[in-house]
Amino acid sequence: MSQQKGNKSRINVEIYGQQYSVVGDESTSHIRMVAAIVDDKMRELNAKNPSLDTSRLAVLTAVNVIHDYIKLKEEHEKLKESMTQKGME
């Protein structure tokens, strides 16, 4: 189910077997994609750590996703700097 209110989208998604109502500025397809990635990451980590309860699994998922985000952000900054340097030559 999805609704639009102003520029906000409200959509129900399932993450790791739980239903969540998510509200965001992005399209419903974007919100679904984000939810699917979170679900995939949680299932991937659960396969490696089956003894973790859901709360710990969620925190570990958040830590891993933020780690990936920071690495990508650093790589992006290096690429921008490299392009700036090449533009100055």
UniProtKB/Swiss-Prot annotation:
Subunit structure: Homodimer. Interacts with FtsZ.
Keywords noted in UniProt: Cell cycle, Cell division, Cytoplasm, Septation
Superkingdom of origin organism: Bacteria
Cellular component GO terms, alphabetical: cell division site; cell septum; cytosol; plasma membrane
Role noted for this protein: Activator of cell division through the inhibition of FtsZ GTPase activity, therefore promoting FtsZ assembly into bundles of protofilaments necessary for the formation of the division Z ring. It is recruited early at mid-cell but it is not essential for cell division.
Gene3D superfamilies tied to this protein: 6.10.250.790
An individual GO BP term: septin ring assembly
Membership in a protein family: Belongs to the ZapA family. Type 2 subfamily.
Lineage: Bacteria, Bacillati, Bacillota, Bacilli, Bacillales
Pfam assignment, any one: ZapA
Gene name for this UniProt entry: zapA
InterPro entries: Bac_CellDiv_Activator, Cell_div_ZapA-like, Cell_div_ZapA-like_sf, Cell_div_ZapA_firmicutes
Main subcellular localisation: cytoplasm
Record localization: Cytoplasm
Name under which the protein is recorded: Cell division protein ZapA
Protein's UniProt keywords contain DNA-binding: no
NCBIfam families: PRK14126.1
